[in-house]
Swiss-Prot record:
Belongs to the class-I aminoacyl-tRNA synthetase family. Glutamate--tRNA ligase type 1 subfamily. NCBIfam families: gltX_bact. The lineage of its organism: Bacteria, Bacillati, Actinomycetota, Actinomycetes, Mycobacteriales. It catalyses: tRNA(Glu) + L-glutamate + ATP = L-glutamyl-tRNA(Glu) + AMP + diphosphate. Monomer. GO terms for biological process: glutamyl-tRNA aminoacylation. Gene3D superfamilies: 1.10.10.350, Glutamate-tRNA synthetase, class I, anticodon-binding domain 1, Glutamyl-trna Synthetase, Domain 2, Glutamyl-tRNA Synthetase, Domain 3, HUPs. Catalyzes the attachment of glutamate to tRNA(Glu) in a two-step reaction: glutamate is first activated by ATP to form Glu-AMP and then transferred to the acceptor end of tRNA(Glu). GO terms for molecular function: ATP binding; glutamate-tRNA ligase activity; tRNA binding; zinc ion binding. InterPro entries: aa-tRNA-synth_I_cd-bd, aa-tRNA-synth_I_codon-bd_sub2, aa_tRNA-synth_I_cd-bd_sf, Glu-tRNA-ligase_bac/mito, Glu-tRNA-synth_I_codon-bd_sub1, Glu/Gln-tRNA-synth, Glu/Gln-tRNA-synth_Ib_cat-dom, Glu_tRNA_lig_a-bdl. The keyword Protein biosynthesis applies. This is Glutamate--tRNA ligase. HAMAP family: Glu_tRNA_synth_type1. It comes from Mycolicibacterium smegmatis (strain ATCC 700084 / mc(2)155) (Mycobacterium smegmatis).
């Protein structure tokens, strides 16, 4: 088994918005395939017409593309085991079901949930124990009688009367005792296949060697192993894949991260201005680490080092502050022209316009690259370049534009009006001479009113560079307006 070419799969259901737990699962599968030189198969589990949507399907594709996780087989790529959407594979499942029924691996079960509970109660058992395998040995006459009543059976797999064990690549040896897992349904009463059937059937037919998935699905593993063995006996499967159950992702209060938690929504992170490198780096840390002494690494470095055997089995908590810090590191690591291009695209997407030309925008971007945590932070720092977006923050004004700042603004205006070459060095020299030497002010007292007047805020990109980019006329006009208000 372990000598086979690694084939892993990512098989989300197209429901709702992609969440970080789903993406973490995709990342670990993708990284393991790339690390081993194997195949990353992307499959869509869209057998629930009531919940599935084309919008969610498109969102999953969008998420994978944005993150740069390419797939070797799947929708829009194709592959030897097409189709890769379960809704298009119904005939395949019906054929497998027929073969399982013919071989006696599954049987028709007519019991209703109410009848199962009643039998448990009559025997003094907990009525919520689940199915009791009652229909296993129905006679032909009993089945006919149920059918004559108009009942339509589900099909259930005969679970073996033995322990079901596997060596989980994350959790180690795992065993479910004989009799602890009842016979389970693989079809609905209308004959439609259930997830419990189609997932292992697709894995078998697509020759998936390793199943990496969330630990919440671990209780279904003994059922799937039993089904794989049945599929092997009828010639559908060649082997039982290896399993690795990834740790849960926790949210605030150490509760499992829910789809209702804002930080679980992948696209909210993108909208804030996370870059793929930062988000993927952080998601990789939810159960794995490249080394004890550093948490920041590239995707290539992750691929080179990733082994599913190194994944930690303990739950991992989503820490937004740490995610932000790692994203900030990745932003700082970008080449300046790369950061500029991404920031421009982000601004265009969100309708932000600095009104700067390309050259000036690149200079402005360079001023904030080391000052932002997410791309969205940059708009608050750069919007003052747009006269329509510029406004003086009242808290900053209350602190810096007091009556006593009039002398500072007067001196600044007088010095700057005499500047001939409107460049950063000239602006800096004029203001320092007038304010630090002339008025004998400390830098914070000297430049605080200037900064608020020019940028509208107490926190801004470097002041002198900002004034050069803003230009002489607009800088002086804002200083005069600020002087008038004090």
């Amino acid at each position: 088994m372990t000598t086979k070419k690694v084939r892993v799969r990512f098989c989300p259901s197209p429901t709702g918005t992609p969440h970080v737990g789903l993406v973490r699962t995709a990342l670990f599968n993708w990284a393991y395939a790339r690390h081993t030189g194997g195949d990353f198969v992307f499959r869509i589990e869209d057998t629930d017409a009531a919940r599935d949507s084309d919008e969610s399907y498109a969102a999953i594709l969008d998420a994978l593309r944005w993150l740069g996780m390419d797939w070797d087989e799947g929708p829009e790529v194709g592959g030897p085991y097409e189709p890769y959407r379960q809704s298009q594979r119904r005939e395949i499942y019906r054929d497998v079901v027929a073969r399982l029924l013919e071989a006696g691996e599954v049987y028709e079960a007519y019991s209703t949930p109410e009848e199962v509970e009643a039998r448990h109660l009559a025997a003094g058992r907990n009525p919520k124990l689940g199915y009791d395998n009652y229909d296993r040995d129905l006679t032909d006459a009993q089945r006919k009688a149920f059918a004559d009543e108009g009942r339509r059976p589900v099909l259930r797999l005969r679970m073996p009367d033995e322990d079901l064990s596997w060596n989980d690549l994350v959790r180690g040896p795992t065993t479910f005792a004989a009799g602890s897992v009842p016979d389970f349904a693989i079809t609905r009463s209308n004959g439609d296949p259930l997830y419990t059937l189609v997932n292992p059937v697709d894995d078998a037919l697509m020759k998936i060697t390793h199943v990496l998935r969330g630990e919440d699905i671990l209780p279904s593993t003994p059922r799937q192993i039993a089904l794989y063995r049945a599929l092997m006996r009828i010639g559908v499967a060649e082997f039982v894949p290896e399993f690795a159950h990834l740790p849960s992702v926790l949210g605030e209060g150490n509760k499992k991260l829910s789809k209702r938690d804002p930080q679980s929504n992948l696209f909210l992170h993108r909208d804030r201005g996370f870059i793929p490198e930062g988000l993927l780096n952080y998601l990789a840390l939810l159960g794995w680490g490249i080394a004890d002494d550093h948490d920041v690494f590239s995707l290539d470095e992750m691929v080179a080092a990733f082994d599913v055997a190194d994944v930690n089995s303990n739950p991992a908590r989503f820490d937004q502050k740490k995610a932000d810090a790692i994203n900030a590191e990745h932003i700082r690591m970008l080449a300046p022209e790369d950061f500029t291009a991404r920031l421009r695209e982000y601004f265009v997407t969100h309708g932000y316009d600095t009104t700067l030309d390309d050259a000036a925008f690149a200079e402005a971007a360079a001023l904030v690259q080391t000052r932002v945590v997410v791309l969205g932070d940059a708009w608050g720092l750069l919007k003052f370049f747009n006269d329509d977006a510029y406004e003086i923050d009242e808290k900053s004004a209350a602190k810096e534009l007091k009556p006593e700042s009039a002398a500072v603004l007067d001196a600044a205006l007088s010095a700057l009006e005499a500047v001939g070459d409107w460049t950063t060095p000239a602006i800096e020299a004029a203001l320092k001479t007038a304010l630090l030497e002339g008025l004998e002010l400390k830098p914070r007292k000297a430049f605080g009113p200037i900064r608020v007047a020019v940028t509208g805020a107490a926190v801004s990109p470097p002041l002198f560079e900002s004034m050069e980019l803003l230009g002489r006329d607009r800088s002086l006009a804002r200083l005069r307006a600020a002087r008038d208000r004090v």
